[in-house]
Amino acid sequence: MITQCPIMPNKNFTYGFNVVGQEGTLWWHAHVPGLRATLHGAFIIRPRHGADSYPFPKPHKEIPVIIGDWWEKDLDEMARNMTKNIFSSYASASTVNGLVGDYFNCSGVAKEGFVLDVEPGKTYLLRIINAGLFSEFYLKIAGHKFTVVAADANYVNPYTTDVIAIAPGETVDAMLIADAAPGRYYMVALPNQAPLPDLQTPEYATRGMVKYKINHRPCNVTMAVSSIQGGEEEKEGYQGTSCDTPIGPKMPDVHDTITSFYFHGNLTSLRHQGHLLSQQRIDEHLFIVLGLGTICKQGQFCKRGNSSDDIQVATMNNVSFQQPAAATMPLLEAQYYHISLNGTAQELLRRPPTLYNFTYEALIPFGPKEMPLEPTYKAMLVQRFKHGAMVEIVFQSTTMLQGDSNPMHLHGHDMMVLAQGLGNYDLVKDVASYNLVNPVVKNTVLVPNRGWIAIRFVANNPGVWFMHCHYEFHLVMGMAAVFIVENGPTIDTSLPPPPDNCRTCGSNINLTPKEFYLQSKKSET
């Protein structure tokens, strides 16, 4: 456990926290593997002084748009299977606000899915969240454009686009003006993935509808159920009455990852960060390579494909994260009570043990150059930072990841995105491209497919924080680490004690953290 013991069946836990210095769209979700597919929701922080204080025109309405998955399989079993190298479970459909839309005929009747009713000329603030487990999505509305105004609860310079690219864990706030001819317009969410020879997985688009509120004659036309493939056009630009077939958008190709690369690269912060970045003081440098490896079920190194006992794992600098085998106290409480992690934790390597051509085509899994790399193993990866340290991390993707971009999420902090690129990171050339004026600020950053991203953050929130990939299969496979931020010089910059209603784990489940700590100290004497 990182921050707390699980909430047991038929039990409850009340969270108490302060919202300070944040506005915008966030979301909450479970952190038990697979469970967040259904246990999640929007968490919206509005300005203290109301919508009139937004740094953009006051919208007529605010609408959450949550993209997710529909599962017909046991999610707990899926998570267990992934730890056994079984990857056969996929979502049966995609959803917008919990509705699968008319691509799917689940009960013998096709339903139109989520409908956004709009009035001509009005402006709507869409609070878009990707709560899916596995896929980045492209979101488009036929005949309309978006103006992106925020990402991950941080305001951005207004950016006009006809497509939103959003990875698992990310949020995007976008203004939509109902300025098209009155009618019905499809809202389509299309998952993307890299093309062959990378691994192909089942992907399902879904759609809702933007419907103009107008007086029109009754319409008895049944909405046609049709399929969509990225890159096909569904009569975009056709203007008809509300009884005609709704207008569909021209979507990016399902194998297009470049549109996402440019979407994320065009985001800049509305608030300049020069006061933080002009000092050029970097206290900690990390170069983290994201990859895949193989271990035996017994923990030894195996050559992939040569044994039924080998297991594929996801890695950061060639080590795969694992929880301690018998944890009775979350790491957050251990940090507060100054309990040593010696013997249970390993420091996250600041650079990979071996440098190589990370984006070399032959490194595709099962390829001829795959195995000369360093052996992989599992450990509880931890990296400590002094309070107030300026930390720079470069995340480097590899060909081994089979074309996946990787949404890396850091709990408890925002990250300034300095630059991104394709191919291998170049320490000399790429530093010159850093945006040190107004880099976009996010809590989830998308490492491009076979590319890199450079971020900085200030370690000013004391505690124990999870850094992990927001693709569920990569997280379950071990693409994660723990960042520990030490106490600052004052009470306000130090970790507070665990709340009294926070129970311990295992056989000590009825003890408060303080009772458990005192009992442990007594047993040592």
What annotation goes with each model-predicted range?
Residues 51, 73, 195, 491:
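Surface-exposed, flexible loop/turn segments at secondary-structure boundaries
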Residues 253, 259-265, 272-275:
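Long, low-complexity intrinsically disordered regions
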Residues 54-56, 77, 494-497:
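Short, charged, solvent-exposed linker or helix-capping segments at domain edges/interfaces
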Residues 1-3, 148-162, 168, 196-226, ...:
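Active-site pocket scaffolds in enzymes
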Residues 59-132, 232-234, 250, 266, ...:
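Acidic-aromatic/histidine active-site loop/patch
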Residues 134-135, 194-196:
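Short beta-strands and strand-coil junctions in structured, solvent-facing domains, enriched
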Residues 1-72, 111-143, 164-189, 272-294, ...:
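Beta-strand cores of secreted/periplasmic/IMS beta-sandwich domains, seen most often
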